[in-house]
Amino acid sequence: MELTLHEARVIGCLLEKEITTPEQYPLSLNALTLACNQKTSREPVLDLSEAQVQDALDSLTKKRLISEQSGFGSRVVKYKHRFCNTEFSELQLSPAAVAIVCLLLLRGPQTPGELRTRSNRLHEFKDVIEVEDCIKQLISRTKPILKQLPREPGRRESRYVELFSETSANVVTTSDHTDKLHTAPVAALVEHGALVARVTELEQQVATLTQKFDELIASLT
């Protein structure tokens, strides 16, 4: 699946609210819009209108990732995800994996340390190692749903990105390109060094042959 930025935000919010405020789930359009536009725990911070959120919901409904629910005697339509862990979902994830995917959908690429710090309301990880173990499982799936990004200068940990959204696809492409740009000069320097060493070796061989030739000429005269 490939989600737009708005679709990814909607799915992330539904995953989050299902866990953190189950008494308010499913969400109405108004509640979902407020969740999408939160100023905290969101990167980037968005300012979506209800019409934009409705467009995202309509698109997700066509992708069979959202279902509508109307309460008895209520005209308010509420929405719940079919993204994972439902009878209609191909994707089945552990609570730990749901927490990680949810955070990556809502806040973009993050390190294991950041994921552990920010996940306390979604899932309690004992330590960073438990986060890393879960990440490895998600990467090693037959169809990986996470990817490790090249470690950035000054960072002790690599960041990880989900592979569901077009935004994350752009991040992966940019990171791969940057990594190649860093790798190319290093490879060029290595190749240049090898050429210099070879030229020096040949020059020494020529000098040795020249000396022997001069000695041979001298012995014949």
Curated annotation (Swiss-Prot):
Domain of life: Bacteria
HAMAP family membership: UPF0502 (MF_01584)
Family designation: Belongs to the UPF0502 family.
Protein name in the entry: UPF0502 protein Sputw3181_2381
Biological source species: Shewanella sp. (strain W3-18-1)
